[in-house]
Amino acid sequence: MSFVIAAPEVIAAAATDLASLGSSISAANAAAAANTTALMAAGADEVSTAIAALFGAHGQAYQALSAQAQAFHAQFVQALTSGGGAYAAAEAAAVSPLLDPINEFFLANTGRPLIGNGANGAPGTGANGGDGGWLIGNGGAGGSGAAGVNGGAGGNGGAGGNGGAGGLIGNGGAGGAGGVASSGIGGSGGAGGNAMLFGAGGAGGAGGGVVALTGGAGGAGGAGGNAGLLFGAAGVGGAGGFTNGSALGGAGGAGGAGGLFATGGVGGSGGAGSSGGAGGAGGAGGLFGAGGTGGHGGFADSSFGGVGGAGGAGGLFGAGGEGGSGGHSLVAGGDGGAGGNAGMLALGAAGGAGGIGGDGGTLTAGGIGGAGGAGGNAGLLFGSGGSGGAGGFGFADGGQGGPGGNAGTVFGSGGAGGNGGVGQGFAGGIGGAGGTPGLIGNGGNGGNGGASAVTGGNGGIGGTGVLIGNGGNGGSGGIGAGKAGVGGVSGLLLGLDGFNAPASTSPLHTLQQNVLNVVNEPFQTLTGRPLIGNGANGTPGTGADGGAGGWLFGNGANGTPGTGAAGGAGGWLFGNGGNGGHGATNTAATATGGAGGAGGILFGTGGNGGTGGIATGAGGIGGAGGAGGVSLLIGSGGTGGNGGNSIGVAGIGGAGGRGGDAGLLFGAAGTGGHGAAGGVPAGVGGAGGNGGLFANGGAGGAGGFNAAGGNGGNGGLFGTGGTGGAGTNFGAGGNGGNGGLFGAGGTGGAAGSGGSGITTGGGGHGGNAGLLSLGASGGAGGSGGASSLAGGAGGTGGNGALLFGFRGAGGAGGHGGAALTSIQQGGAGGAGGNGGLLFGSAGAGGAGGSGANALGAGTGGTGGDGGHAGVFGNGGDGGCRRVWRRYRRQRWCRRQRRADRQRRQRRQRRQSRGHARCRRHRRAAARRERTQRLAIAGRPATTRGVEGISCSPQMMP
C-alpha cells in the first residue's frame, strides 16, 4: 500500500504556481528571441558575418531547448493537476463508505454522529438545529419561527429554534430568528448552541417583529451560546424584534459565557418601537477572560429609549465588561447600562466602564437625556474602579453622569464620574461622583456638569482617599452658572486633598497639606506638575486643558467644559487621566469635544473624551477617548465622547469619538462614543480602542439615528478584536475588529431595523482571527436589520487563523433581516468565513431573512454560502432560504441538496474522463516513438491510426 499523504488543495495551488511560472518564462524567452536569434553582422567582412551567424545559431539552439523544456513543463503541470484531481476524487469516494457506518452507530446510540455537522432546522418550523459530531462538527442552525396568523387570539410569531451544540472541535449553531407577528408578540429568537472544547458559541437569533401599528411587542432576542472550554469566542446575543406604530421593541438577548481565556459575548441590541427594548447583558468572562459588553438600547419614537445592557462580570481573574449605551428617543433617552465587576482575584483588572446615556427629545417638544451607567467595581484586592458613563444630550434637560466604580480594598484608584449631559433648553445634567479607592490609591474625580443656556449642571463629588492617596477633584460646574462639585479628602497617611475640598478641622491634616504644598512648589514651577497631588481643573471661560497629575501619584484634572479642552494626564507612576471637556454650544461651525487624558505609566485609566458641541450648522465631533496608561502592567483606555447634536435644518450630527487604547500588558480598551442622534445625517459611532498585549479591542460605538455603528478595535497580541457598534434604525452595523497575532476576530455589529417603507442597513462583517492564533475563530457576522420592504443583508463571517490556525473555525454569517410585508423579500444571509489553512472548520452561511408575514407569501432571503475549510476541517453548511409556505420550503431544500449532489457527481465524471484521455495520450506517444525507432532501423511498422490523439488542458476539469 502507499504511505504517501497528499493534500489536494496544496497540489492544486502548486500546479497553479507552476503554470504561472511557466507563462512568465515563456514571455521572457519570446522577448529575447528577436535579439538573440537573428544578429546583425558588425561589418561587411566574412569574419563579422561568421561571428554573427555563430551567436545566432547559439540563440536558435537555446530557443529549441526552451521549447522542449516548455513542453515538459506543460506535461508536468498537467500531470500534477490530474494527480491532485485523482486524490480528491479518491478521497471523496472513500469518506462515505468509511465514515457512514461509524456515524450510524453513534447516531443510533447517542443521537449525534462522531464526525459531521448537525442539520439545520427547517425554516418556518422553529425546529432546533442538530448537534455536531462528538469529535468534529459544527452545530446546525435553528429554524426560524413561523409567522403569526390573522384574527382571533392568534397573531403571535413562533419562537425560533435553538442552535445545535458543537462537537469537541466545532462551533455551536446559530439560533433561529423569531417569527413575524401580524399582531400580538413577535416570536423569541432561539438560543445559540454551545461549543464544547475548541470552537465559538453560536449567535442568538433575532426576535421577531410586529406588523400591526397598535399594540403588541417585538420578540426577545435569543441568548448567545457559550464558548469552548479552551479556545473560541462566546456567541453574541440576538437583537430584539423591531415593531411599527405603538408596539414595544423587543429586548436583546444576553451574550454567551466565555471559555478559559475568552471574553464573554456581547449582549444583543434592543429593538426599536414606541418604547425601545432593553439591551442584552454581556456574558460572563471565562476564568481569565473579561466580561462582555452590554447591548445597545433600542430607539423609541414616542416614549423612553431602551436601557443599555449591563456589562458582564469578569472571570475569576478577568476585568468587568463595559455597559451598553442607552437608546436614543424622540422623548427621553435610555439610561446607560452599568459596567460589570471585575473578578474576585483579578490582579489589577478594572471594573467595566458604565454605558453612555441616550439622547432624547426634539427641538420643538423638548426631551430628556438618559443617565450614564455606573462604573463597575474592581476585584477584591487589586484594581481600579470603572469610569461612569456620560449623560445623554437632552433638548430640555441633560442626563446625569454615572458614578465611578470602587477600587479593590488594597490597591487601586476609584473610577471617575461621568460628565453630565448637555441640556439645550433648561438644565444641564449633574456630573457623576468619583469612586472610592483602596488603601493605596486616589479617589475618583467627579464628572463635569453639563452645559445649558439656562442652568448648568453641578459638578460631581470627588472620591475620598483612605490611607495613601489623593482625594478626587470635584467636577467643574457646567456653563450656565453650574456649581463645582465638592472635592475628596486625602488619605490619612499621605496625599493631597482634591480640588474644591472642604477646609479641614484637624490641625494634623492641615499641617500635612501645608508640607506637601511646599514640597510640590519647585516641581510645579520647573515641570508644570506637582510631585504628589492632582492636576488643577481648567477654569470655566479660560479654555485651559486639565492639569497633569503628580510625578509619583495623582489624577489628571478635567478639561475646561464648553471649550473642548483636553483632560490632564494621570500621575507618572499611577493615576487616572482627566475627562475631556465638552465642545462649545450654539456655534455654527463644528466644535470638537476634548480628548481624555492618558493614565499613569504603571497603573491608570485613561479619561473619557468630551461630548462634541451643539451646532446650529454642523454638529460637533465627539472627543477622542483618552489613551490607556502607557504601562508595563495595567492601563485601561477611556470611553470616546458622544458626537455633538445639530439643531439646524441642514445640520450634520457629530461622529462619536474613538475609544482609548489599553495599556501595554493588561487593561480593557475603551468603547467608541455613540454618534449624535440630531442632524441629517446623524453621526456615526466611534471606533473602539486597540487592545494591549493580552487585552481585547474595544467595542465600537452605536450610530446616531439612521447612522452606522463604529468598528471594533483590534485586539492585542493575544487579544480578541472588539465588537462592531450597532447601527441605529436604518444604519449598518460596524465591522468587528481583527484579532491580535494569537487572538480571535471580533463580532460584527447588528444593523438597525427600519420603519415603514425603508430598507435597512446590513450587518457588520466579523473580524479575522490572528495570523498565528491556535484555535481562535473569526468573528461572526452581524445580523441584518428588519424592514417593511427589504431586510438588510447579514454580515460576512471572519476568517479563521491564517497560517497555523489549529482548529481555527471561521465565523458564522449573520442572519438576514426579516421583511415585515408580503410584497418584498428578506435580507440575504452572510457568507461563512473560511477555516484555518491547515486545521479548522469553516463557518456556516447565515440563514436568509424571513420573507413574509401572515398577509401573504413573500420571498425569503437567499441563504449565505458556507465557508471553505482547512486541509483537515469541515466545510461550512450553506444557509437555507426562508419562505413561509411549507411546500415551497421543503421543495427548495430538497432541490438545493440534490443540486449539490449532482454537481459533485459531474465533477467526478469529468475527472475520470480526463484521466482516461491522459492514458490514451501516453500510449499514443509511446507507439509513435517506437515507430520512429523502427523506421531508422529500416524495419516496417504501423501506427494503427494513433496520429491526432492528444490531451489538451481544456479536456481537464
Swiss-Prot record:
InterPro entries: PE-PGRS_N. Keywords: Cell outer membrane, Cell wall, Membrane, Repeat, Secreted, Virulence. A cleavage of the protein removes the N-terminal 120-150 residues, immediately upstream the PGRS domain. The exact position of the cleavage site could not be identified. It is found in: Cell outer membrane; Secreted; Secreted, Cell wall; Cell surface. GO terms for cellular component: cell outer membrane; cell surface; extracellular region. Residues 893-957 are annotated as: Disordered. SUPFAM superfamilies: PE/PPE dimer-like. Transmembrane segments: none annotated. Disulfide bonds: none annotated. Its main location: membrane. Residues 4-94 form the PE domain. The 77 amino acids long, arginine-rich C-terminal domain plays a critical role in tuberculosis pathogenesis. This positively charged helical domain specifically binds phosphorylated phosphatidylinositols and cardiolipin, whereas it is unable to bind other phospholipids. The arginine-rich C-terminal region protrudes from the mycobacterial membrane and mediates M.tuberculosis entry into host epithelial cells. May serve as a bridge between mycobacteria and host cells by interacting with specific host phospholipids and extracting them from host cells, for their direct integration or as a source of phosphate, during phases of TB pathogenesis when M.tuberculosis is short of phosphate supply. Expression in M.smegmatis enhances adhesion of M.smegmatis to murine macrophages and human alveolar epithelial cells and improves bacterial persistence in spleen tissue following infection in mice. Overexpression in M.tuberculosis improves adhesion to pneumocytes, but not to phagocytic cells. Belongs to the mycobacterial PE family. PGRS subfamily. This is PE-PGRS family protein PE_PGRS3. It comes from Mycobacterium tuberculosis (strain ATCC 25618 / H37Rv). The gene is PE_PGRS3.
